[in-house]
């Protein structure tokens, strides 16, 4: 919806790489000019420094900045303070800021509380990860009223099917079960990391 509503051919956008593959596809569909921010190698794993992101925003002055947090497949995250610096830098030049929180609440930090204060911010979420409902193809956006009204202008007549809508409605009654599942996934990740360490192998932190 953000690409369809806000991006025209020739508009500049900033994307991280590697990241969710469909962002590159959307960029090509709508004719956007992409400035890639490639992760660099560091002692602690893949790294994308906040100052580099902010400086690129100021230099390129893109129509939109799109950053998953956590990113995939790197599993990297921006801290709460660093992410706010990026959002503010985008706001200073009038850029739309799209933060993809598809993995929430597997990663608890969220930028949703900023949506009323940061008029340029859109947060995307999905039922495909923690909720385990990837086959339903259901997600949602959170933004302030002005941005929501803009996005509604490009709202398709047929969004999701009745079966998917009803399934999500039922799923929402099982939030406690979902959170228990999240705890098991996180515990399993720690178990796997410890097992690798016992085998003499190193693993980087991933969210």
What are these regions (language model features)?
Residues 1-12:
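Phosphate-binding glycine-rich loop
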Residues 35-38, 63-71, 97-99, 204-207:
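Short beta-strands and strand-loop turn motifs
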Residues 20-22:
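Conserved coil-to-alpha-helix start sites within the AMP-binding
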Residues 28, 47-60, 73-130:
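Active-site pre-lysine segment of PLP-dependent enzymes
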Residues 17, 36-41, 101, 125:
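Short beta->alpha connector loops at strand-helix junctions that form conserved
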Residues 30-34:
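A short helix-loop-beta submotif of the ANL/AMP-binding
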Residues 24, 120-204:
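PLP-dependent aminotransferase class I/II
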């Amino acid at each position: 919806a953000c690409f369809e509503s806000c991006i025209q051919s020739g508009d500049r956008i900033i994307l991280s790489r590697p990241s969710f593959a469909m962002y590159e596809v959307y960029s090509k569909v709508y004719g956007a000019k992409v400035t890639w921010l490639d992760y660099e190698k560091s002692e602690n794993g893949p790294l994308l420094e906040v100052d580099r992101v902010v400086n690129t925003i100021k230099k390129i002055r893109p129509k939109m900045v799109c950053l998953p947090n956590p990113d995939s497949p790197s599993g990297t995250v921006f801290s709460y303070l660093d992410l706010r610096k990026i959002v503010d830098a985008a706001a200073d030049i009038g850029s739309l800021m799209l933060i993809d929180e598809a993995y929430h609440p597997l990663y608890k930090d969220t930028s949703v509380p900023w949506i009323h204060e940061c008029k340029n911010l859109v947060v995307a979420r999905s039922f495909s990860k923690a909720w385990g409902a990837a086959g339903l193809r259901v997600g949602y956006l959170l933004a302030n009223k002005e941005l929501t009204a803009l996005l509604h202008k490009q709202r398709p007549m047929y969004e999701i099917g009745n079966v998917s809508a009803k399934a999500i409605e039922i799923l929402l009654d099982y939030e406690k079960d979902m959170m228990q599942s999240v705890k098991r996934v996180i515990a399993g990740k720690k178990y796997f990391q410890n097992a690798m360490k016992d085998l003499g192998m190193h693993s980087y932190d991933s969210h």
